[in-house]
């Protein structure tokens, strides 16, 4: 019974591979993307598959290395370091993706969202990093997304310590539901 199921899944996967390849091959020109940028590489494929006619409703791409318990910033400049580089790569990749969607004339059909499975603490630890926290920002983007900041700036106490968290203002599941 299990082997029959595995064979069925393998057959379906093989058939769907043909559909995915046809969608990818249907697009011969795209707007430029930054390199090297692993997130941009993935978003370029997503734009290609959407324009190529793949009917997938939700695509998920991943970009790691945000688990910055140490060396998140430089010791002399909190706006420089590995975290700043990560955020620049995200920004550059999303900008290229949006430019490509416009070039491909499909920007009206796509909405994007960033999310993380964990937030960060308010205050840096002794290793110039931050530990896991409760809340995290989410960014929604796309031509039809209303440009607005939701939520209030949190009050951060003067005596904040490395164990303090920012409380969540919105349940991430409600944001997911709104996107659907």
Regions found by a protein language model. Name each.
Residues 110-119:
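Acidic/histidine-rich, metal-coordinating catalytic segments
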Residues 119-127:
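Basic/polar, cationic surfaces and motifs that engage anionic cell-wall
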Residues 134:
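Glycine-rich and small/hydrophobic secondary-structure elements
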Residues 127, 131, 139-140:
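Active-site substrate-binding loop specific to GH73 endo-beta-N-acetylglucosaminidase modules
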Residues 1-104, 123, 137-180:
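Feature for exported/extracytoplasmic and membrane-associated proteins, marking the mature portion
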């Amino acid at each position: 019974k299990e082997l029959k199921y595995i064979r069925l899944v393998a057959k379906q996967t093989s058939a769907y591979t043909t559909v995915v390849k046809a969608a990818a091959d249907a697009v011969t020109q795209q707007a430029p993307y930054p390199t090297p940028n692993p997130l941009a590489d993935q978003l370029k494929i997503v734009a290609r598959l959407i324009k190529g006619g793949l009917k997938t409703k939700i695509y998920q791409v991943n970009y790691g290395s945000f688990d910055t318990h140490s060396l998140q910033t430089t010791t002399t400049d909190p706006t420089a370091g590995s975290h700043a580089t990560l955020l620049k790569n995200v920004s550059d990749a999303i900008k290229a993706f949006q430019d490509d969607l416009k070039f491909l004339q499909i920007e009206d059909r796509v909405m994007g969202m960033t999310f993380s499975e964990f937030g960060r603490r308010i205050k840096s630890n002794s290793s110039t990093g931050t530990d896991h926290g409760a809340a995290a920002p989410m960014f929604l983007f796309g031509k039809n997304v209303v440009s607005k900041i939701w939520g209030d700036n949190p009050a951060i106490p003067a005596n904040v310590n490395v164990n303090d968290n920012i409380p969540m203002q919105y349940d991430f599941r409600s944001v997911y539901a709104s996107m659907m």
